[in-house]
Curated annotation (Swiss-Prot):
Family statement: Belongs to the ATPase alpha/beta chains family.
UniProt EC number: 7.1.2.2
Xref: Gene3D superfamilies: 2.40.30.20, 2.40.50.100, Bovine Mitochondrial F1-atpase, Atp Synthase Beta Chain, Chain D, domain 3, P-loop containing nucleotide triphosphate hydrolases
Enzyme class: translocase
GO molecular function: ATP binding; ATP hydrolysis activity; proton-transporting ATPase activity, rotational mechanism
Membrane topology note: Peripheral membrane protein
Biological role: Catalytic subunit of the V1 complex of vacuolar(H+)-ATPase (V-ATPase), a multisubunit enzyme composed of a peripheral complex (V1) that hydrolyzes ATP and a membrane integral complex (V0) that translocates protons. V-ATPase is responsible for acidifying and maintaining the pH of intracellular compartments. Mediates oxidative stress response, filamentous growth, and plays an important role in virulence.
GO annotation, biological process: ATP metabolic process; cellular response to oxidative stress; endocytosis; intracellular arginine homeostasis; intracellular histidine homeostasis; intracellular lysine homeostasis; proton transmembrane transport; vacuolar acidification
Compartmental location: Vacuole membrane
Keywords: ATP-binding, Hydrogen ion transport, Ion transport, Membrane, Nucleotide-binding, Translocase, Transport, Ubl conjugation, Vacuole, Virulence
Protein name according to UniProt: V-type proton ATPase catalytic subunit A
UniProt-listed CDD domains: ATP-synt_V_A-type_alpha_C (cd18111), ATP-synt_V_A-type_alpha_N (cd18119), V_A-ATPase_A (cd01134)
Length: 617
């Protein structure tokens, strides 16, 4: 009798719980690949996070029509049937922001892949697995800031810091942007995990507790106090980019190119060598072996910070959404990456976000749009492709962060674009070019000639050159003039090459022959770089500047000698050793230091002028 009574009580509790939660559940009405339609969803909001089916697959509401909601599911929907439950969570798709982001690899919706592997013992992500993005067991040494009990605090204020790793030794703990109040208690120095309460704030008579982490919806840009104009270069270590087509910290860059042109290599060299504090690398729909390459190479690569070598993985977060992962999650991966970048910008860091490749993201938009039955535009892409791209790129920039103390950070976006067949009139490329300020166009013919980086200097451009002239004038006088001269030589040589193909080189004047010879020298020894060598994998800006001076000095001296009546064929023969010295300038090891480099290059400049003076006598 007692057993029957107990069972009846349990059943009543279960039924009352079901009644309570019934309003939070809908039912699946139809399934079409990653797009699921659910009914009985009155009260749900756009972009609300839902759990689909008995496996609790993660999905997001993207359209509401009456009591029906259309959901894009971020996991494989095989086995989901009509009538399965859909649980509404009442919150948007958000990411966790706090200590532990560095050195971690996530999927498109910020699930930590290593933690999932350890938990599931599988190389694939089990459906419906729910692992927190930030480790709940790792302890961090929290140091409170200058704020104390009784002080007023607003969104973005720094109330403490932790040591995350030797490259990020001052990870600032921020109050979420929408929070404010008066501090009622703050934790003392000590070890805490990301869920432990370290701050208690009272506002309007209510007390709120805050830990070292907070969540933020990925589709909402994090607020800033003020947007600033960017004026400091994003140095890549690639001579052709730093000299001719520079980008700024807080700028937007597009790298379109056909398959095998070296987009991923440029993206990876940016991650390895750029002057950014934090790198967010988003592999969006690219091949899995490219992400595996990053994972294997990065821990072995070192950067020198204040005299000590550190693995660059310590400043990197990877968001891997490879081509065999669900299509819908590609869209989320771009937003996840930019939200992580904005979080570090709010700490006063200069962040580079590399998206490889935004074409795969656009393809995911096209597939979802097609399944929704929306009107297709150019090449089947949705009509809102340009607006989606613009809203993403507009989240880049240099800004003053919210809260105190004052800090300035930046987010630079470098996005690779893979147009089919290398056709730059592709809708994704044209939409991207209308938004981004720097265009590094890759050339298939250069790549086939093994000329890397395969940047086509005649189609590439940067709208930041004038903005950066102030920086160059104060640090490297003559830089702008040298850059313009190199561009002029290259464009003149292109016209002369067409003449040579028609009438031969002998028909050219000596002055034109010099232009052609120096252009070849610039292409082979300045624009080209060997990424597998110690001397050329990374070229500091001072070495780039000194090499520019050497090439232009050689060109000017040759032109001066010919103008004074010397014959170029004889002059070239008698000064061949100087030409060899100029072309060998790239072999100088940057590790020997700037002082030694400048000394060696100034000796080279004086040798050039002396040898030409002797030869023309």
């Amino acid at each position: 009798m007692a057993g029957a009574l107990e069972n009846a009580t349990k059943e009543i509790k279960r039924l009352s719980l079901e009644d309570t939660h019934e309003s939070q559940y809908g039912q699946i009405y139809s399934v079409s690949g990653p797009v699921v339609v659910a009914e009985n969803m009155i009260g749900c909001a756009m972009y609300e996070l839902v759990k689909v089916g008995h496996d609790n697959l993660v999905g997001e509401v993207i359209r509401i029509n009456g009591d029906k909601a259309t959901i894009q599911v971020y996991e494989e929907t095989a086995g989901v049937t009509v009538g399965d439950p859909v649980l509404r969570t009442g919150k948007p798709l958000s990411v966790e922001l706090g200590p532990g982001l560095m050195e971690t690899i996530y999927d498109g919706i910020q699930r930590p892949l290593k933690a999932i592997k350890d938990e599931s013992q599988s190389i694939y992500i089990p459906r419906g697995i729910d692992v927190p993005a930030l480790s709940r067991t790792t302890q961090y040494d929290f140091t409170p800031g200058k704020l104390k009990v009784g002080d007023h605090i607003t969104g973005g204020d720094i109330f403490g810091s932790i040591y995350e790793n030797s490259l990020l030794d001052d990870h600032k703990i921020l109050l979420p942007p929408r929070a404010r109040g008066t501090i009622t208690s703050i934790a003392e120095s000590g070890s805490y995990n990301v869920e432990d309460t370290v701050l208690e704030v009272e506002f309007d008579g209510k007390k709120h507790k805050y830990s070292m982490m907070h969540t933020w919806p990925v589709r909402v840009p994090r607020p800033v106090a003020e947007k600033l104009s960017a004026d400091y270069p994003l140095l890549t270590g690639q001579r052709v980019l730093d000299s001719l087509f520079p980008c700024v910290q807080g700028g937007t860059t597009c790298i379109p190119g056909a398959f095998g042109c070296g987009k991923t290599v440029i993206s990876q060299s940016l991650s390895k060598f750029s002057n950014s504090d934090v790198i967010i690398y988003v592999g969006c729909g690219e091949r899995g072996n490219e992400m595996a390459e990053v994972l294997m190479e990065f821990p072995e690569l070192y950067t020198e910070i204040s005299g000590r070598k550190e693995p660059i993985m310590k400043r990197t977060t990877l968001v891997a959404n490879t081509s065999n992962m669900p299509v819908a999650a590609r869209e989320a991966s771009i937003y996840t990456g930019i939200t992580l970048a904005e979080y570090f910008r709010d700490q006063g860091k200069n962040v580079s976000m590399i998206a490889d490749s935004s074409s795969r993201w656009a393809e995911a938009l096209r597939e979802i749009s097609g399944r929704l039955g929306e009107m297709p535009a150019d090449q089947g892409f949705p009509a809102y492709l340009g607006a989606k791209l613009a809203s993403f790129y507009e989240r880049a920039g240099k800004a003053t962060a919210l809260g105190s103390p004052d800090r300035i950070g930046s987010v630079s976006i470098v996005a690779a674009v893979s147009p089919a067949g290398g056709d730059f009139s592709d809708p994704v490329t044209t939409a991207t070019l209308g938004i981004t300020q720097v265009f590094w166009g890759l050339d298939k013919k250069l790549a086939q000639r093994k000329h890397f980086p395969s940047i086509n200097t005649s189609v590439s451009y940067s709208k930041y050159t004038n903005v950066l002239n102030k920086y160059y004038d104060s640090n490297y006088p003559e830089f702008a003039q040298l850059r313009d001269k190199i561009r002029e030589i290259l464009s003149n040589a292109e016209e002369l090459e067409q003449v040579v193909q028609l009438v031969g080189k002998s028909a050219l004047s000596d002055s034109d022959k010099i232009t052609l010879d120096v252009a070849t020298l610039i292409k082979e020894d300045f624009l080209q770089q060997n990424g597998y060598s110690s001397y050329d994998a990374f070229c500091p800006i001072w070495k780039t500047f000194d090499m520019m001076r050497a090439f232009i000095s050689y060109y000017d001296e040759a032109q001066k000698a010919v103008a004074n009546g010397a014959q170029w064929s004889k002059l070239a023969e008698s000064t061949s050793d100087v030409k060899h010295s100029v072309s060998s300038a790239k072999f100088f090891e940057p590790s020997r230091g700037q002082k030694e480099g400048e000394k060696e290059f100034s000796e080279l400049l004086s040798t050039i002028s002396e040898r030409f003076a002797e030869a023309s006598e």
